[in-house]
Design a protein with these regions (language model features):
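P-loop NTPase Walker
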Residues: 1-129, 141, 214, 238
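N-terminal alpha-helical segment
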Residues: 3, 32, 203, 219-222, ...
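A short structural micro-motif
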Residues: 17, 181, 229-232
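Hydrophobic residues in alpha-helical segments
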Residues: 40, 211-212, 230-231
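ATP-hydrolysis module of ASCE/P-loop NTPase motor domains
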Residues: 100-107, 124-221
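Short basic/glycine-enriched coil/helix segment immediately N-terminal to the Walker B
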Residues: 230-241
């Protein structure tokens, strides 16, 4: 399958954890993709029990496409007894469509943000927010431009602060930094220094309420809320283990 000896050992490893240490461009993604295909094709692994995390959405798409092709090649040989390249285009499309329905669609391949968003689509209704806020499974996701626009609206319209002295962009960064530390507004306020820090915590509190009112999450929430949900709910933790 075009793998070197080290890649083949990684692909064939079956029981227990395996750590692969290799530099950029050495074929780690290739080995991982072949390993997933090997686990499904040779060991009958359940696709829904396989998790692969990438840094970018592009890498996730490419991994899924490669995997579909590898599994379609296997299926062509087992079902038709002939190489993939000799199949008519219509049968190739049918095989890839079948692989997508039965395998690719069930796999958990994506970035941390994408995978956690998928998790929240299942279980966000079980999340108990410390400030009593709620979201439904149909939540929308605000990109950075949406988030900055909302913070600016709170700073300039709700609190009527001078945006030149209390910059919305810096405030948004401070809120993002707080979320990445796992802090809610009360924790940010407790660690704040001076009036500016107190105001930032106030903006953060209003920002969260505005997000919830719009049934929206920002990118930081996609990491923070799942962690909090898993910490607080044993049933959810057991399900996703």
């Amino acid at each position: 399958a075009g793998l070197n000896d080290a890649q083949r050992r990684a692909v064939d490893h079956h029981v227990g954890p395996l750590l692969v240490v290799a530099g950029a461009g050495s074929g780690k993604t290739r080995a991982l993709t072949h390993r997933i295909a090997h686990l499904i094709g040779e060991h009958g692994a359940d696709p829904a029990q396989i998790l692969a995390v990438t840094f970018t959405n592009k890498a996730a798409r490419e991994m899924k496409e490669r995997l579909e092709f590898l599994l379609a090649q296997r299926l062509a040989q087992s079902q038709y007894g002939q190489p993939w390249s000799t199949l008519p285009p219509v049968e190739q499309r049918q095989l890839r469509s079948r692989i997508y329905r039965e395998v690719t669609k069930e796999l958990w391949i994506g970035t941390f943000h994408a995978l956690f968003a998928r998790m929240l689509r299942y279980d966000i209704d079980k999340f108990k927010d410390a400030e009593g806020l709620t979201w439904t499974k149909q939540f929308s996701i605000y990109d950075e431009a949406d988030a900055q626009s909302l913070v600016k609206e709170i700073v300039t319209q709700e609190l009527q602060l001078d945006p030149k002295r209390f910059e919305p962009k810096k405030t948004r960064w401070a809120i993002s930094n707080a979320k990445n530390q796992g802090w809610l507004p009360d924790q940010l306020e407790a660690n704040a220094e001076g009036q500016r820090g107190k105001l930032t915590a106030d903006v953060y509190r209003r920002y969260r309420k505005a997000l919830a009112a719009n049934n929206a999450l920002d990118f930081d929430d996609l990491l923070l809320l799942p962690v909090q949900l898993l910490q607080q709910n044993e049933q959810v933790r057991s399900y996703w283990h």
